[in-house]
């Protein structure tokens, strides 16, 4: 099942909204595929907003830590290093050097435009349907001429919140504030949603770029109650397998250890 927009699909901008895909169901009545497709479309909307919303910033200084240690490589992981190769359009213009480790069992899509990369942990049932258990995508955020400052990020979070509330069934923002992803300071919000008795939990973390750079990243995390280690939105990125990714995320090209 294709669960992301095909080549040539519309690039949704602020004010535009993807439509919900009709869900498929397994014999157990679980939602498969359709809600996953919706979530991935929403990730694309988020990144489009991110690229748009932060063009308004001017004369702000980055507060991001630039002296960080290399991450340790956990067992049974692969490294993703973002590359300019094959990039075009906005992804080329707004390229960000970053890397992270992710579990070998996760599926990777390294060209899910307008995101740089998306990795996903899935549960496949007996009917061949699949559920998103944990999902992680990286997009860019950019300032004009100067680096982003975390003081601007609450304004971006407000734009995100408006878009998510229009897209997710039974959406509710539950928290917002400063956060830390590995060695980096940032700003995040978390939310819950529910569709056909499946609970979804989301976390969007925005990281300003290191000093001297103008492009940061938006880390979009979606999880569901099909991940047995998770019991609520507070667990996203704290339990399950997402912490391996977050702890190893680094600005810069990275190198395998």
Predicted regions and their residues:
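N-terminal targeting sequences that direct proteins away from the cytosol to non-cytosolic compartments
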Residues: 2-126, 181, 198, 220-257
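Conserved polar/disulfide-associated segments of primarily extracytoplasmic proteins
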Residues: 73-76, 94, 111-231
């Amino acid at each position: 099942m294709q669960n992301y927009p095909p080549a040539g699909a519309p690039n949704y901008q602020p004010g535009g909204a993807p439509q919900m895909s009709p869900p498929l169901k397994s014999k157990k009545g679980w939602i498969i595929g359709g809600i996953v497709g919706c979530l991935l479309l929403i990730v694309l909307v988020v990144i489009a907003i991110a690229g748009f919303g932060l063009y308004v910033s001017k004369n702000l200084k980055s507060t991001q830590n630039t002296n960080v240690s290399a991450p340790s490589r956990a067992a049974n992981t692969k490294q993703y290093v973002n590359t300019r190769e094959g990039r075009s359009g906005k992804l080329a213009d707004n390229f960000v050097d970053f890397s992270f480790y992710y579990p070998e069992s996760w599926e990777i899509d390294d060209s899910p435009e307008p995101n740089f990369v998306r990795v996903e942990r899935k549960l496949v049932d007996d009917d061949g349907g699949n559920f998103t258990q944990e999902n992680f995508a990286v997009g860019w955020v950019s300032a004009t001429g100067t680096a982003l400052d975390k003081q601007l990020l609450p304004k971006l979070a407000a734009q995100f919140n408006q878009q998510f509330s229009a897209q997710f069934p039974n959406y509710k923002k539950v928290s917002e504030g400063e956060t830390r992803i590995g060695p980096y300071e940032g700003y995040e919000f978390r939310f819950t949603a529910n569709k056909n008795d499946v609970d979804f939990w989301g976390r969007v973390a925005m990281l300003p770029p290191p000093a001297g750079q103008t492009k940061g990243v938006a880390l979009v995390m979606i999880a569901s109650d099909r991940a047995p280690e998770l019991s609520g939105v507070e667990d996203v990125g704290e339990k399950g397998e997402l912490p391996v990714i977050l702890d190893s995320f680094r600005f810069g090209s990275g190198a395998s250890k």
